[in-house]
A protein has these predicted regions:
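Acidic donor-binding loop of glycosyltransferase active sites
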Residues: 275, 292-307, 324
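N-terminal subdomain of nucleotide-sugar transferases
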Residues: 1-64, 114, 142, 168, ...
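Carbohydrate-associated surface elements
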Residues: 179, 202
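Conserved acidic donor-binding segment of nucleotide-sugar-dependent glycosyltransferases
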Residues: 340-341, 345-352, 361-367
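Conserved donor-binding/catalytic core segment of Leloir-type glycosyltransferases
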Residues: 212-240, 252, 297
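A short, well-ordered alpha-helix in the C-terminal region of glycosyltransferases
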Residues: 275, 354, 361, 368-383, ...
Length: 418
């Protein structure tokens, strides 16, 4: 049976727990997986669950170190050079600035995929890795599928024409929430849309099961990369409002990111230094312990100035499964996570007073917190069970791998767009 390959920008990556979960879910169902990492992994904590992963991780060399012509001549395939020419002609109109280096990656990956016995490639995010997968297939390599998330479809810089081509060339393209599907309806043509399938990310419900612990009083937990779209500055404003009311609320913010200095400065400006702890990046076992000791979870996500946003924040899924009452915003797929407000509290984005009121109301009402805890756990069991989601995805991969064994399996067209 051909192998399944994941083509990722970096692996492992602390902030991409959903990818590790997905890989473990596929292996649990018997998939034979190889991971191709396009860049070296960052020096950061590792999730303990990584030790369970059996898949080999193949580190690709930097594209500037790849000799595409040497690879081409080494292949000895008379059809390869014409395919390269056709791919270059077809994609030249998009003017992708890194196209030459991505083509070099695809040529190298063609050989590596054959050596690894790869029959299908899956890429997360419709960014450079997806284009490499598309080129790989156009050069005679295995077919591919995609998972579309948020930055790859919402940012102002997204090229809708190229996105349409990548999705249309895929065996199928997953996206992680219904809100994304609706957004894609306005971006993609009929052929590409026919390949889009909604599948929620799944989490390990046994790992995140509530343990019956009573959370610390007035302890708000928030987790995410320290970037604009997570809404941490709004959360700090809300906490400052609660502090001015004389409440003894405290908060732990878990994560690292480009806005750390900005957030640290704002903590000091608002007089929250004794109340807010920036814990940095932490592995999943430590995060789980924090979830079980907090009173509630808050993540006031927002749409960034560049259009970027969260689609289906994994930490909200985890908090929900752990029975931690959640406060968030109606951005993208978050209402789907919180069941339209039945499994958590939704407040307007960028609204610190509304966020403060929601936090205060929950901190003052243990019975409501208990109701939301039960409702959140039940909703996670219905919609975000890793075992269930893995089965669905496994079936799609099996179909793609079976199609790969058929000589008539199609390839992306190598004609230029009109």
């Amino acid at each position: 049976m051909p192998r399944l390959a994941y083509l990722l920008k970096k692996f492992p990556r602390l902030s991409e727990t959903f990818i590790l979960n997905e890989l473990l879910g596929q292996e649990a169902l018997g998939a034979d997986v190889t991971v191709f990492s396009r860049r070296p992994a960052d020096d950061e904590p590792r999730h303990p669950q990584l030790a369970r992963l059996r898949a080999p991780v193949v580190q690709l060399p930097p594209s500037k170190e790849v000799d595409p012509w040497g690879e081409l001549f080494a292949e000895g395939d008379d059809e390869l050079l014409p395919r390269v020419r056709a791919a270059v002609a077809a994609l030249r109109p998009y003017g992708h600035p890194r196209f030459p280096s991505l083509l070099a990656e695809a040529v190298l990956l063609r050989r590596l995929a054959r050596e690894q016995g790869v029959g299908h490639v899956h890429a997360h995010f419709a960014t450079d890795g997806a284009l490499v997968a598309h080129l790989l297939h156009a050069l005679g390599g295995p077919g591919y599928s995609l998972t579309l998330h948020a930055k790859d479809i919402y940012r102002d810089t997204v090229d809708a024409r190229l996105l349409d081509r990548l999705v249309a060339g895929s065996a199928f393209s997953v996206t992680v929430c219904d809100a994304n599907v609706e957004h894609l309806r306005g971006m993609l043509g009929a052929d590409a849309l026919s390949r889009v399938r909604r599948l929620y990310n799944g989490i390990d419900l046994a790992l995140f099961a509530p343990d019956g612990r009573v959370g610390d009083a007035d302890h708000v937990l928030s987790i995410g990369r320290l970037v604009e779209k997570k809404g941490f500055l709004v959360l700090l404003e809300a906490l400052a409002l609660l502090a001015r009311e004389g409440r003894a609320v405290r908060a732990t913010l878990v994560g690292e990111g480009e806005d750390r200095a900005l957030i640290e400065a704002r903590v000091a400006e608002l007089g929250l230094s004794g109340r807010v702890r920036l814990a940095g990046a932490l592995p999943q076992d430590v995060v789980l312990d924090l979830m079980r000791s907090a009173t509630l979870f808050a993540l006031p996500c927002l749409v960034g100035e560049d259009g970027n946003r969260d689609a289906l924040p994994t930490v909200l899924l985890e908090a929900l499964a752990a029975g931690l009452p959640c406060v968030s915003t109606p951005v993208t797929g978050i209402p789907e996570i919180l069941d339209g407000g039945r499994a958590g509290v939704l407040v307007p984005e960028r609204d610190a007073p509304a966020t403060a009121r929601a936090l205060a109301a929950l901190l003052d009402d243990p019975e409501r917190r208990a109701r939301l805890s039960r409702a959140g756990r039940a909703h996670a069991q219905r919609c975000f069970d890793l075992a269930v989601q893995a089965h669905v995805l496994h079936g799609w991969f099996a179909q793609a791998l079976a199609a790969a064994a058929t000589p008539a399996a199609g390839r992306p067209t190598c004609t230029s767009p009109a």
